[in-house]
Amino acid sequence: MDPTHQPFRLYAEVIVNANINKILDYGIPAELENLVTVGSVVKVPLQRKLTNDKYKIAIVLKIKSSSDFVHVIQPILDISYEGITLPQDLIDLIFWISQYYFCPLGSAVSLFLPTVYAQTHSTKHQNNVFLGQNAERTQEILKTLDNPQQIAVLRKLLKTTKPLTPPELMRKTEVSAKTLDALVKQKFIRIVDSADLEIQDEQLHYFLPDPPTLNQEQLDAVNTISQSLVAEQFQTCLLFGVTGSGKTEVYLQVIRKARALGKSVILLVPEVALTIQTLSFFKMHFGSEVGVLHYKLSDSERTQTWYKASRGLINIIIGPRSAIFCPIQNLGLIIVDEEHDSAYKQSDLPPFYQARDVAVMRGKMTNATVILGSATPSLESYTNALSKKYTLSVLSKRASTSTPTKVFLIDMNLEMEKTRKKPFFSQTVIRSIEQRLEVGEQTIIFFNRRGFHTNVSCSSCKYTLKCPHCDMILTFHKTERILLCHLCNTRLSKPITSCPQCLGTMTLQYRGAGTEKIETLLREFFPTARTIRLDSDTTRFRGSHDALVKQFATGKADILIGTQMIAKGMHFPAVTLSVVLSGDSGLYIPDFRAAEQVFQLITQVTGRSGRSHLPGEVLIQTFLPQNSTISHALAQDFPAFYKEEILGRKVCNYPPFTRLIRCIFLGKCSDYTLKETQRVHTLIKQNLDSQASLMEISPCGHFKVKDLFHYQFLIKTRNILVANKQIQEALAAAKLSSKVRCIVDVDPVTTFF
């Protein structure tokens, strides 16, 4: 094309943050020619009618002198995020994620932006409203208030998960500033400048264990890992250390080595809940070099940290899975703590990436050293280590300050024979808790179900109350007096006095137990004990998790009851008793990872007690005392568990011997959704690679969710990219109706739900 007909002197090929899989051309205005480069984050109009204040964010891939689309070309509107430029490794990672995880390029781009809502980097601070210092008592406080405006404010803050400014809160609750002032005076709420939300050093000491002297195994691990770090060669190391073996101290020494070499670090933890303790530990050692990234930060906070990391003002980033996409400069070390944890897999929204695997790929692209740390490695990672694909460093014993923990199994079948009913607590557990209370030691109780009663059923017709929108039994939450669906969050707050099916009155029975009931029973057994419950109900508002953990860590509570969030990586030196109330519950799920997840969970809970000089004890209640998974967890023998479990995986051809792709089809009409699923299934079967295998169609474990019916089938393959191409061709040929949606999940963590 004749360059004289080009309306711009320079053009940019970009990927737009939208659900499209195309690279688009935009013109570069003269005033931006010296600012736009490869990797620039820019603002572009996606439709011709968009005005200057309506735009999409895009990443620049290439600068060129001409375009074949001059008749429709539009200009780049401006640079974004203060002219931050993504490094080439992140651009390459966008393409890899799009290809591997079966998602449009535009969807992959969204992972690499701090927030699609923050228009530019800003150092301006804003006030946010939070619950007061006694946030965990808000439900009790509500019962004492008679002012409807104040009640409305507190209830709104209980339900919200994002920071609200005073004007936003007043608008949403229709109250005046006087109402907020009154709540502030009563210390029921706090109004805080966003700049003051960063953790101050003096607030961190209650989380920190005493730094031990490294033992020989730890020193060997540090030396092994440091070799690739010094050589600037890509290497993945599996750090397999029993609970309490001092993996964090190994991380610390390797990070020091990386910083001495001028390299930056990304440290991933599986959940936001763990970020506070990890941040506390490393901020004490590295101070302002450390930054944190996670979804509970405000848009401006997240953007500021992202900006500082890209400018080299922060050299250590800590956060959950999304932190792996931070554009930190001169990356040399990536650590994935608790690498086995399913929270590293994004399962709620596409792209359905696995952050552990993305970390390994980013390490490969940057010649960085990658550490995968765990006391219970995933079977995939352990297999890679045994086959020498990864290096293996083993910490086989607890650190010098820790005492070996004694683990005991309690056969609940025998307890039933004694009491002639199904008890929640064995007599052994009751006595053991009493002993800890007498000497001032702490207890952790693990029970992986929320709520008070897990089901409500009719004694006459046997009907069980279910969510009207999901194939899910409703759970009774006593504190809020509601029946709640744990899938779609539907709440039934009106009292149900008769059976919806047979209309019988006085026939409804509340059965089962969740953490809320366990807490109530413990208060009945031990009325003077100070108990804390840690689950998604008590930690749903900002700051509540940290406040509860601090309360327990500083000895202001005796017993901590919680779901799986208490099993992960927390350090409480005064805890000498850990109790697993239902050690076998996860084994009843028909999923190929069920045994692995039960083993991991029990082992992680086991590691919460006896982490200091005090001896620890673990009690595991089970109705399956002969089950081999529980026996291996009891013995804390991962190699024995692996040896047994890997045989079953090989016979059934499941990971790590193959890769899985899960195709899920959703629609409002069950029959029609099934027919569409069958059409695509047939097309894939006709063209599938001979080395891959196609499983039959089945309903998903959660068949109906939010009024949509779910069907699925699995593909087993050793070449994900080839299989993805065949799926894409089948979907294109099928031309699915708009009434049915297809989700492709590569390397799923579950094949059932």
Swiss-Prot record:
Pfam families named among the record's database cross-references: DEAD (PF00270), PriA_3primeBD (PF17764), PriA_C (PF18074), Zn_ribbon_PriA (PF18319)
S-adenosyl-L-methionine as UniProt keyword: no
EC number: 5.6.2.4
Binding site for ATP: G241, V242, T243, G244, S245, G246, K247, T248
Domain Helicase C-terminal: 491-646
SUPFAM superfamilies given in the database record: P-loop containing nucleoside triphosphate hydrolases
Keyword match Nucleotide-binding: yes
Catalytic activity: Couples ATP hydrolysis with the unwinding of duplex DNA by translocating in the 3'-5' direction; ATP + H2O = ADP + phosphate + H(+)
Gene Ontology MF terms in the entry: 3'-5' DNA helicase activity; ATP binding; ATP hydrolysis activity; DNA binding; zinc ion binding
BP GO terms, sorted: DNA recombination; DNA replication; DNA replication initiation; DNA replication, synthesis of primer; double-strand break repair
Binding site for Zn(2+) 1: C458, C461, C499, C502
InterPro entries hit by this protein: DEAD/DEAH_box_helicase_dom, Helicase_ATP-bd, Helicase_C-like, P-loop_NTPase, PriA, PriA_3primeBD, PriA_3primeBD_sf, PriA_C
Keywords: ATP-binding, DNA replication, DNA-binding, Helicase, Hydrolase, Isomerase, Metal-binding, Nucleotide-binding, Primosome, Zinc
Placement of sequence motif DEAH box: 337-340
Helicase ATP-binding domain location: 228-395
Cofactor detail note: Binds 2 zinc ions per subunit.
Gene Ontology cellular-component terms listed: primosome complex
Family as reported in the entry's similarity comment: Belongs to the helicase family. PriA subfamily.
Functional description taken from the UniProt entry: Initiates the restart of stalled replication forks, which reloads the replicative helicase on sites other than the origin of replication. Recognizes and binds to abandoned replication forks and remodels them to uncover a helicase loading site. Promotes assembly of the primosome at these replication forks.
Name of the protein in its database record: Replication restart protein PriA
